[in-house]
Amino acid sequence: MEPPIGFRASLFQFLLFLPYFIGLLFLGFIKGIVLCPLVCLVVTIGNSAVILSLLPVHIVWTFYSIVSAKQVGPILKIFLCLCLPAAIILWPIVGILGSVLGGALYGFFSPIFATFDAVGEGKPYQFFHCFYDGTWSTMQRSFTVVRDFKDVCFHSYFSLMDELKQSCPDRKYYEIRLLQLPGALVVSVLGILVDPPVISLVAICKSPYMLFKGWHRLFHDLIGREGPFLETMCVPIAGLAILLWPLAVTGAVIGSVISSIFLGAYAGVVSYQESSFYYGLCYIVASVSIYDEYSTDILDLPEGSCFPRPKYRRKDEEPTPFSGPVPRLGSVKNASSMRGGSVRVPMIDIKPLDLLNELFVECRRYGEVLATKGLINSKDIEEARSSKGSQVISVGLPAYGLLYEILRSVKANSSGLLLSDGVTEITTMNRPKDVFFDWFLNPFLILKEQMKATNLSEEEEEYLGRLVLLFGDPERLKSSNAISASPPLTERKRAELDAFARRMQGLTKTVSRYPTFRRHFVALVKKLSEDLDLKDNNSAKDESITEPPAPVKIISRIFSQRSFRRKGSVNGSDQESQKGVSRNVDIV
């Protein structure tokens, strides 16, 4: 379906679109009004139960972890223990109120968006799905939200506390300078008093421009079928985006007001880091200019700011080849300059946890190989099933899969991360534009550039793989090196590989704290336990010497089950992955 050409055709298409849009919006509103209280009730009761039931454990374990932490100095321990009561009081209040608000918003808007998504191009039985989509699925996801919240409060919390009690490799720990605290606190208070009013005024003054320019852009894209509405499947959502744009502007203003509080309070951090009260005051003035320049760039206004920007650091930070941020997609100005000739190209749908889903595909594939080599044994699987946990299964195997994801991207000279299908690539240009995904993707891109600069040989890559997989078990690492000859390494090269292994395991531990990862891993352990019980009950005649080792069968069956939300069988997944950019991965 091509976009209309000419003013009359565009106007006719627009008038024809209005009743279609109003009908879908009305239906979505009805479903949202019905489901909003139910979803809000489920999320509020579930999250409140998790918060209140774990609160005593959190209080006791947090104090114990801080007191026994090896990464925190004694003075900082006392300071944190004095600040903890305020955090303990605020946590239930903020958590429960956030659950009420989040549950209500999700219960209302999720059916609306699902209603519009049901009439996308190529969707079968559109009339039925207009009524059905967003009803039962929203209720199911509300229970998933509670489960993910429980994983964060339980698994992720204890994982962070355990890491806090571990000593750093360089034997350093964090400490606080008491003499700098009074000045830093005074600067923070001044920043909170000065920055929020000024930044709020700037945001309010720029909000009308953002409102009308956004409407102009959305109407232009809708009629001319450019930008986000280039694909026909996006057209039904166009009217909803136009209608909700004032809410987006209001949210941007509210977000600016809230963030200005933290921006002003950060002046105390600058004062503490620079050991200077004066530099903290300079940051209070410069932060207004920083916000003004950022908002100017977003709104495609002339560069610069009318506010002064004094120097607030003793020494300018010099960017290093690997310490700087990964380049992101440019501002609206850069994007608008590329809009002149819209080329109708296939749309690549990269979802925020697409890389995480590919990680489990890699784990399944490499798990079979590693089990065949004996690097993964039955003891690892037994520990993964127990509450003790297995470092090799829970951290080593995902880190191994991510390592070869990075190495494959390096060999292909990819600007991002090349997925296992050899076609789909996650870059800073097509990745989801939320800050959460920056935290997810950017560390791996930085590590990829570091490995690319190191120029590893195949023997060094294999050694690094064993190092990543068995880094938490030195004895098994030595035995694996005895079986597979270790390449001749200089002290510098060995130190580099050790640093890469520590970095990979650290990043994997961070990823393992994401709620979705934990849900997948629980399904893995559950299926693992079932397969082991089934194996124990099998007769001796079923254990043929021609069969692959038990860990191979177990890992293969684990990662091929529907618990990983892969549509179709393993072969079906492989065929689907070969379609490259046209695939649409369903990740919950």
From Swiss-Prot:
Q: How does this protein sit in the membrane?
A: Multi-pass membrane protein
What domain of life is recorded for the organism?
Eukaryota
Q: What cellular component terms from Gene Ontology apply here?
A: membrane
Feature: compositional bias, Polar residues: 570-581
Where does the sequence pass through the membrane?
A: 14-34, 49-69, 78-98, 184-204, 235-255, 257-274, 275-292
| Cellular compartments annotated | Membrane
Q: PTM Phosphoserine: at which residues?
A: 486
Q: What are the entry keywords?
A: Membrane, Phosphoprotein, Transmembrane, Transmembrane helix
Which intervals of the chain are annotated as region Disordered?
566-588
UniProt-listed InterPro entries: At3g27390-like
What PANTHER family does the record point to?
A: (RAPE) HYPOTHETICAL PROTEIN (PTHR31133:SF16), MEMBRANE PROTEIN (PTHR31133)
| Protein name according to UniProt | Uncharacterized membrane protein At3g27390
